[in-house]
Amino acid sequence: MLYDFLKRTLDIIGSLFGIVILGLIFPFIAFAVKLSSPGPIFADVPKRSGKDGKSFKMYKFRSMIKDAHLLLQSDPKFKKLYEEYKKNSYKLSHDPRVTPVGHFIRKTSIDELPQFINVLKGEMSLVGPRAYYPDELINQQKAYPETKKYVKTLLTAKPGLTGPWQVSGRSDISFEKRVKLDASYAKKRSILYDLKIIILTIPALLSQKGAV
């Protein structure tokens, strides 16, 4: 299929360019992350759901304290926070686990630059649906049964470094709206639509709307 060939070509070119940029800033970001709090440079987070539900490890610079995801689910002092996390579409507007450096790299989306590696490996695309956590999809579909058809559709496409959710408010939009947008993208995806989203991503990143 011509679209698949062109999209993969665009992904390879774009990811190689992104990896060059990543290589230039990596020493500085790595130093800042390590200086901000003890722990690894890359986030140690659960795997994400990729195309057809296949799980993969998504690379991100660590923006939180070490073992942040494990602590959220197991530490008693985070119990109320975990309930808020699930209720708020697996996002927190004021997350005490985020480090000072983490706030900056999340606001500027620098933490997501390592995902160019996922794109080059073919696990992600430059443009696509959000990369959801498997338990997020399970729990949210239980809470909102009407979203099941959208989840099924969005999983037919590779998750993206950017996508309709990125240019439509990011964390400001609900799970229901997010999966509708992602399913709509999966249905009408095209190279022109991908290029449009890439262009719209620039002002979205500059505005930092919905970034937490």
Feature names for model-found ranges:
Residues 95-127:
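Structured, soluble extracytoplasmic/luminal domains of envelope-associated proteins
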